[in-house]
Amino acid sequence: MKKLKLHGFNNLTKSLSFCIYDICYAKTAEERDGYIAYIDELYNANRLTEILSETCSIIGANILNIARQDYEPQGASVTILVSEEPIDPKLIDQTEHPGPLPETVVAHLDKSHICVHTYPESHPEGGLCTFRADIEVSTCGVISPLKALNYLIHQLESDIVTIDYRVRGFTRDVNGMKHFIDHEINSIQNFMSEDMKSLYDMVDVNVYQENIFHTKMLLKEFDLKHYMFHTKPEDLTETERQEITAALWKEMREIYYGRNISAV
């Protein structure tokens, strides 16, 4: 898309929001409590602050203030106030390609924010535990939140991801013509690296005329040992392994499709 010469500030709002899920099986009540404590510590307010501070760097935002909070019995959120750095619009990369990978939180850039909240969860029966992180990156001006997508998915090591991207409002060029989007996009998937896309089954539901884009991701490879907490698959009977695998896979599909699935 040809770069626009605008009249005044770019008034478009670009919002990227997604849910990231991590699934685990904990055999006993003690193991379930241990998993919740482990995941709560792994994604505490300090670590989330580090992740979102790097996110601000990736999208080109300048941090003004940070507020963070860990909750009892579990969960965390962080808030970062930021401003848009003095960037030459000619240097902003608006092309449709993946952002960088790494080697809650709210941020405010002029009229923009980044936020993340965590939700560890388990049920006393069945042994299934889930961890959900809700993240939203909303920006005004030339900054694109899509550049942080690759980094955030990689950092949070997700089994399931649901992503929404929307462009709202309009901006005017020097001739007074309204523009309701200032960059090309056919799919959120085009902002992910090839190695990232190879790991997931993905489906898009897009409403192009409304500048609304939606992508769902489900991890392709399933290895039971990666989903067990303090229990080795080889210590279980074949029947137990099959039952746990079926329960985990059902849980993941229900979250991915957003509906309860009857047992076969």
UniProtKB/Swiss-Prot annotation:
It is an enzyme of class 4 (lyase). Disulfide bonds: none annotated. Its cofactor is pyruvate. The modification Pyruvic acid (Ser) is found at residue 112. The active site is at 112 (schiff-base intermediate with substrate), 117 (proton acceptor), 140 (proton donor). Binds 1 pyruvoyl group covalently per subunit. Keywords: Autocatalytic cleavage, Decarboxylase, Lyase, Polyamine biosynthesis, Pyruvate, S-adenosyl-L-methionine, Schiff base, Spermidine biosynthesis, Zymogen. Coiled coil: none annotated. One of its GO terms (molecular function) is adenosylmethionine decarboxylase activity. The keyword Cytoplasm does not apply. Signal peptide: none annotated. The record marks 111-112 as: Cleavage (non-hydrolytic). It comes from the Bacteria. Its EC number is 4.1.1.50. One of its GO terms (cellular component) is cytosol. Catalyzes the decarboxylation of S-adenosylmethionine to S-adenosylmethioninamine (dcAdoMet), the propylamine donor required for the synthesis of the polyamines spermine and spermidine from the diamine putrescine. Heterooctamer of four alpha and four beta chains arranged as a tetramer of alpha/beta heterodimers. Belongs to the prokaryotic AdoMetDC family. Type 2 subfamily. This is S-adenosylmethionine decarboxylase proenzyme. It comes from Salmonella typhimurium (strain LT2 / SGSC1412 / ATCC 700720).
